[in-house]
Amino acid sequence: MATIIVPMEMKMNLKREQEFVSQYHFDARNFEWENENGAPETKVDVNFQLLQHDQENQVTSLVVVLSFMIVFDRFVISGTISQVNHVEGRIVDQASDFNQEEVETLARPCLDMLNRLTYEVTEIA
């Protein structure tokens, strides 16, 4: 397991595990089907799933889950990418405990993976 330590504020450090791509779909758009059933819409969601609180060591483990459907002119990509993160020095009870900058920092590796996969797939498609 590769671990990357990211300082996030004076009171918190972040250890990350490797990103995991559980689903990644590339589909050509079917405009005939869309005319009958409706066009897909772009949607990107970032959610957090709490795994564990370690009160003694002040570590919260959570999974960042990026779910997406992104509509382009000729194709649609969709899927799910996740990553386990260990927040050191802070107990987190819910996603709202993070400020916007922290949410963006937590989500960044999954978004970077999405960008990389999309670039590589669309380059050859």
Sequence positions of predicted segments:
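Helix-rich interaction surfaces within compact, conserved domain-sized segments
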Residues: 110-111, 115-118
